[in-house]
């Protein structure tokens, strides 16, 4: 839609374009590849700045209104008296205006498409700027808005220029006729809601404003309007043809010539020129303004995420005198994407997608993404074995794709379409009135991004059901770009609108037979009749808070079933926003913290990294199963380890394998071997072991691959994609020498045992160890008690929408059974003096409303060394849900500086999330033992521990543990991490059993059966001593 006469503000408002799904723009220029109009070839070749691009980022003037009708007519030509400075790009909600709203599924406005509320927050921006006088003499001056949420009208010097919507793709307008010498004034009226908001119901914060770059671009009268590159490889991949289609514009294009030059590392590879005019395409002739060239390339360096080899293509438009009018340029990656034999392949090899979903989110800047944050995201992803990213759920900032090209990441580029809150979800997708809007969101994305080699898959959007509009857009995509597959999950991931079976949150082995959209287990799915497509999970492993359990199980399936080709973890970063409390201190806020209604509370906290991009423990776990190296013990005598490279295209030219053999964490022997493997190759290593019978303890072999030299995405000596493995070699026990006997003293109220400088006190009324003195100093702040519950995880809560409670969720079952309100009752508490030791036996029943849920029998033995030995048996009622844990809890008086342990570490790990942890002897500061999840939950566990030292306390056995300044009760009752208050001493939780955290999703019970207590009786032992 174009060439509409200039209208008054009141006339534009009366027309209400923002409530008409057929109207998506007025006067917006056609979509195209990014343009720069360089003046010389070296600048274009080197991707230097272009003098014909002028940024308008900076401080604009801004006035806020609660509805567009409140904007005065005079604002079009002059600022309002209350105008303030507003940074561009930014979201105005992050600058103190209006309220950010977080919802997952629920629309933030009443559902009545295409209409939006009368109260429609409106931001009025203005900027005074100047342009080069030469720009006014000839050529075309455009303005490019890379992202405005959600719709806007544009004026220049009081003249209405046009209108646009679609928050995530550029809106470009021709300003030439409106510009004048000296100062010029832009006015942009941005509406928070428009009919397009019904297509933008993504799981994210709903914010507004000019949140991406604003740029002026000057083009000559005769110009390159667009270009499209395609690389074609022969079967042997040793010869390629670069095909380039160019579209020219302007009155004189017919007399022009385009010179194409292909560069690699600054050196010219090939050059060819062509005049405009295509081959005849139909009975009416040819495209006069188009031209096509093909450039053969011998032995091309191929692009992949592992080897992001890039060429540079420059396209110089010359006038009849041979003078350069302008040059456009882009990176070129030679690669072939295809689906054949049921497999997604790149350059002939089946891919294994180590992917993650990524929202554009910044805790302080909202949806504004700067280059440094983009680079940090990519570098962190690659350092943790990720090779792919899904742009969930909209086209990203244009710089993102260039960085993915250059660093090496496979990209799923996704259209800005989601109608999750509609009932049914497919309501708009099956309505032809919404086809134009949906179509522009797909076609314009492709026209902007199709030259990027990193983009290997197009996506039609997310969670919008399945309708005829999807089928139409799928066919357009397959016709326009046959070089890439298309994926779309809506309608059950099994429709004709997708080349890939791409379900979300399908389980490895368990079916979810939902009506109309069943989710079969992924192993079953690829074996369904007539199903020949690859399966790649568009979302899986929901990393909400303390989650990500069972991730390794997916990777066991991916590695053993070729057509299970990986997936995209949900998701990259916790979508929390920085907020200040009443005292001016900053904290990370989630849904509802801004008074936003509706909201879905902490459901925005699903990241592998915190908002500041520091890692969650789950990131390390992702690092492990999807690593590029796997290790197999081939034989034990001699000890031979085989290393398998998962690189498809890279030789191991920067990898060394470090190995250590350690007894109880103490290194016995170590070595290093340079790896020299071809892609997908193997290498065997024989390790000469020392004599292992010389002492007690467990002996482990740890292996790890490191990269000695720095890479573009990692520093030197980093663990190569976290590639590590561990193998138990031997376990022996040590007998302790005999020393002085412990002495028992009894009264009606207490049992007291003394051994040298130590005294233990058991209270007969409670049956608990209530105090432990050393040198007369109390070391306990609470009794040692049974512990069967945990501060609920998000996965335990099992609520995907804050207004709904799932009675099948673990926490609801535990609450109903009374596990958070147990009353212990002592049945037995007696002690006996033996020759060298004292034995205390106790028996407790843990009751809820008079019903016995647990029976705990304990035998405490204090031996000649002053060591407390515990032998505990716990029996459970047959009709109660399986508990979160079985163990003990105590509040220690000491606040140690460090915690030391022998077991899995160093980071937090849980029974179903411990593959990336290493066996070793670890030391961490006490504060590092706590994981600061924004929504407080159970955290900080370390598994498979054999020795623990917390200050003077040393515990031995085989157990899991956590040490924290915060009690489980405080964690359970606190809504935000910054509200936690450190308690004196520290809390020690000692677990014989701890249920997995789950994570297949966060709204249904997802802990695998093997990580749920399978027996109704559990016995465990440990020893505890205090060291001077």
Curated annotation (Swiss-Prot):
GO terms for molecular function: beta-galactosidase activity; carbohydrate binding; magnesium ion binding. The record marks 359, 393 as: Transition state stabilizer. It holds the Pfam family Glyco_hydro_2. Na(+) binds at residues 203, 603, 606. It comes from Enterobacter cloacae. The keyword Cell membrane does not apply. Disulfide bonds: none annotated. Keywords: Glycosidase, Hydrolase, Magnesium, Metal-binding, Sodium. SMART domains: Bgal_small_N. This is Beta-galactosidase. Substrate binds at residues 104, 203, 463, 539-542, 606, 1003. PANTHER family: BETA-GALACTOSIDASE. Belongs to the glycosyl hydrolase 2 family. Mg(2+) 1 binds at residues 418, 420, 463. The active site is at residues 463, 539. GO terms for cellular component: beta-galactosidase complex. Its cofactor is Mg(2+); Na(+). Its EC number is 3.2.1.23. Binds 2 magnesium ions per monomer.
